[in-house]
UniProtKB/Swiss-Prot annotation:
GO terms for molecular function: adenyl-nucleotide exchange factor activity; protein homodimerization activity; protein-folding chaperone binding; unfolded protein binding. It comes from the Eukaryota. It comes from Saccharomyces cerevisiae (strain ATCC 204508 / S288c) (Baker's yeast). This is GrpE protein homolog, mitochondrial. InterPro entries: GrpE, GrpE_coiled_coil, GrpE_head. Keywords: Chaperone, Mitochondrion, Transit peptide. It is found in: Mitochondrion matrix. One of its GO terms (biological process) is protein import into mitochondrial matrix. The N-terminus is blocked.
Amino acid sequence: MRAFSAATVRATTRKSFIPMAPRTPFVTPSFTKNVGSMRRMRFYSDEAKSEESKENNEDLTEEQSEIKKLESQLSAKTKEASELKDRLLRSVADFRNLQQVTKKDIQKAKDFALQKFAKDLLESVDNFGHALNAFKEEDLQKSKEISDLYTGVRMTRDVFENTLRKHGIEKLDPLGEPFDPNKHEATFELPQPDKEPGTVFHVQQLGFTLNDRVIRPAKVGIVKGEEN
């Protein structure tokens, strides 16, 4: 009985450990179709992403190209503006220089015209001086008519000289001053014991200046120095 039971147990144990062949999974047609659809969707999705990335790259390239183009245009315009500014500044400087030159030329022309006119008037001033010097002191005291005439001539001379002075014309009377070759013309020299050598002791003809510029030097006699 024991022997039978042992044999039965061994037989049962062998059967339970018989290796089984691997089973092939059961795949339905609908599952296969779904898998194919998913693969195609994944492919299309990857392709769409690739196209989108490509388009983005193209857009970025176009934007970069446009930016470079705009930067180039900006640089060109900036350079052009700088050149125009330089030209404008030079033009303004040239115009101002021209204004200064024109102003100086106009002033020179005025001074020249006034100088010529003044020189023509100086003879009249000299004539007034000669006329007044022609009156003798004794005659002025003896005759009221001569005295009145002298006063009238002197007043006329004073009015005339004041008019010249208003236009920048001044008398140059260097009596007692040191000789200045820029303002005086020495016509003779004489020794004068009581005066300093080189001093103007006689004015033969008055000089005149126009706006501090000599238009006629004074003709003078100066003190001669002692000879060694």
